[in-house]
C-alpha cells in the first residue's frame, strides 16, 4: 500500500468501518503514519467486541438472526451482509487493535467503546521524530 502523498502531508487521518477490510491493516497504519505530520492525529472507528460477556452473547444472536433477516429485506446482495458479520467476528478486540496501532508508528493510543462495545473509536498521535 503506497498512498500517493508526500510524507507529513496531513494534520490527521481518519478511517471508519474500513480498516478491517484492508488485507494488511498494520501496513495501512504505517502508511497512515507516514503521510501525517509529527503530532498529527489518527482516529479509527470500527466494529468491535463488546466487553460484557452477556451483551456479547446477545449481540451474537442479533448478528445470526436479525442482521441476515434485515439484509434479505433491504438488499439484493445477501452475501455482503454475510461478509459483514464474518468480518466483524474475525476482527480483533479493542486491546489488540490498540497494540497494533502502537506497534505501527503511533503513540498515545487510546480507545473508547461505543454502543456497549459494538463499535470502538481508537485515537493516537504520531510521535515527534
Please place each PLM-identified region on the residue numbering.
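Residue-level signature of catalytic and energy-coupling elements of molecular machines
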Residues: 18, 66, 124
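Residue-level signal for the nucleotide or nucleotide-sugar donor/cofactor binding architecture
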Residues: 20-24, 89-92, 119
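A short glycine-rich, Lys/Arg-flanked "PGG" loop and its adjoining helix->strand segment in the class I
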Residues: 26-41
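A short SAM/SAH-binding and catalytic strip from SAM-dependent methyltransferases
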Residues: 11-25, 48
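C-terminal alpha-helical "lid/dimerization" subdomain adjacent to the S-adenosyl-L-methionine
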Residues: 45-104, 110
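A short acidic, Gly/Pro-enriched loop at the edge of an enzyme's catalytic core
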Residues: 1-13
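C-terminal lobe and adjacent flexible extensions of AdoMet/dcAdoMet transferase-like proteins
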Residues: 99-129
Amino acid at each position: 500500500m503506497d498512498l500517493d502523498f508526500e510524507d507529513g502531508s496531513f494534520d490527521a487521518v481518519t478511517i471508519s468501518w474500513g480498516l478491517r477490510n484492508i488485507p494488511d491493516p498494520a501496513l495501512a497504519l504505517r502508511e497512515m503514519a507516514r503521510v501525517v505530520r509529527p503530532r498529527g492525529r489518527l482516529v479509527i472507528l470500527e466494529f468491535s467486541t463488546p466487553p460484557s460477556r452477556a451483551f456479547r452473547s446477545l449481540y451474537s444472536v442479533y448478528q445470526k438472526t436479525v442482521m441476515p433477516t434485515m439484509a434479505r429485506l433491504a438488499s439484493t446482495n445477501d452475501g455482503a451482509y454475510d461478509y459483514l458479520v464474518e468480518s466483524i467476528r474475525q476482527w480483533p478486540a479493542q486491546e489488540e487493535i490498540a497494540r497494533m496501532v502502537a506497534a505501527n508508528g503511533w503513540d498515545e493510543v487510546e480507545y473508547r467503546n461505543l454502543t456497549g462495545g459494538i463499535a470502538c473509536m481508537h485515537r493516537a498521535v504520531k510521535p515527534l521524530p
